[in-house]
Amino acid sequence: MSHYHNYIVAAMDMLIGDPDVIDPDEIKPDTKKKADFLCIPIQYLDKLGEWRHELSSRGEASKRLINSMGGMLSYLNNHPNSENAFTLANGMKVVFREVPHSIEAHSTQLAISLGQELKNKLASKKGSVAIMTGSDWMVAKASAAHIDVARINPDIYTGRTKVNLPLDAAQLWTKDHHISEAEWKDIFPGKNIHFNEFVEFEIKNFGQAQGGYSNIGRFTYDNHGNPAVIPLKYVKFASPSYRNIRPITNVQAMYFEALLAPVDEIPIVVFSGIFGTGKTFLAVAAGLNGVGYHTTKPDVPYDRIFICPRDSALGKDVGFLPGSLPDKTMPMAMPIIDNIYDVMKIIRDTAGTAKYPADEEKSKDDSGYNSSKKRNRKHAKPQNNDNAMVKKTSSGTISKEVLDITNEYFEFQPLIYMGGRSISNALIYYDEFQDVERFQARELVSRIGNGSKIVITGDPSQLSNPHLNRTSNGLNYIGTKLADKPYAAIIGCTDEDEIVRHWVLREVAKALK
């Protein structure tokens, strides 16, 4: 193999992290020289064959990689000593090399040993060797062995961009409130913009003088059906009861715009945000407004709010827990219940009264409403007494009022019971999606039915699934795959200054960086 000049050695995390990265145009070591061959320690095949039976992203990735190899594995079985190169479907040439059997197949040392061997062979020749990995640990080991690294660190799509709008173009926005796609290309040549991407304009001598979030736009279709950056349209609740629930930061304004947009305009919302940015709170508020809680709207978009509890994202079975399914899921539902209470409290403060009279249209002997009545109902207003009418549950003491609202509007379903479901006319909320495997993410998104909106949130910095990382998790997977799709809004937030839950959290986030 002395005539081969430039090599990329595959670390195992590169193979199972996402086989899509095996692309000639993407595989470039730090030396900026394009690789001629991708070298894989042959012992990795044993692990790929073992892992392909797993119900996990690792198993799925192993199957995809094996399938992409076509007849390569069959040929290797018949020619175990062959050093011929094989070509994958995407054109990348691959060679398998034996590494001493004393090294275990799953060891990170396999790639290091193969890299050192190839580097020694090239000592007197022109060429390069680099180890391809996304692991910080592998980068450190390669550096210690004086081997270059081809780092897998794909950019994470945030769905937002900040630009300085030239003064001569400022009137297009501040006066016309409209920048067409052609005008965008003229103002910002070479800067691409995706559908449903949010734009924060910085305009010298203008600022935010017009108030609100007038400096934020969204790239979508205008009233004439033409692609353009237009102002936010849905960022405020129409119901007076919800008028004090409003965005505090720019990223919340973007998230809220997507939440309140009609289902036929944005049926999928993905918000990847640092803790304390209002991911769950705003989703709960939008959901309660959407089912008609404390509003007088004659028609509402949703019949229910569907929640996949956070602990079930890790695939935890709840079957062993005592009680009915609602009893089993109640401990997982507490983050939602906390936010229901917070939303109710703001609604009370908005009304400015200690106690609301019951709606005249709701008779005293009416114990509730069934699902067929949900679209044309009025609801009793909450009593402004946080300690009144409480009920003790296995998860603690919950206000009966909050519990009644939870039972009336919310449905909790663990991940393991989601297969085959079709959820219509609902706001479907998936939290902690950073702990969801990619194959699970596809299954969950496919549960959407007519009239439903899916809201997916999570924080990649708080991974609990040991098999995932910040790029291979379900949250980033869905956000990346749906970027630039007109039916999806993808929003990312990593700025500590956009934390709103408590001022001290901003300082904590900065200290823990």
Predicted regions and their residues:
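Polar low-complexity intrinsically disordered regions
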Residues: 1-5, 24-35, 120-128, 148, ...
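Hydrophobic residues in beta-strands of the RecA-like P-loop NTPase core, especially within AAA+ ATPase
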Residues: 10, 429-430
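Intrinsically disordered, low-complexity sequence elements enriched in Ser/Thr/Gly/Pro
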Residues: 56, 216, 371-375, 499
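Short mixed-charge
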Residues: 80-89, 342-403
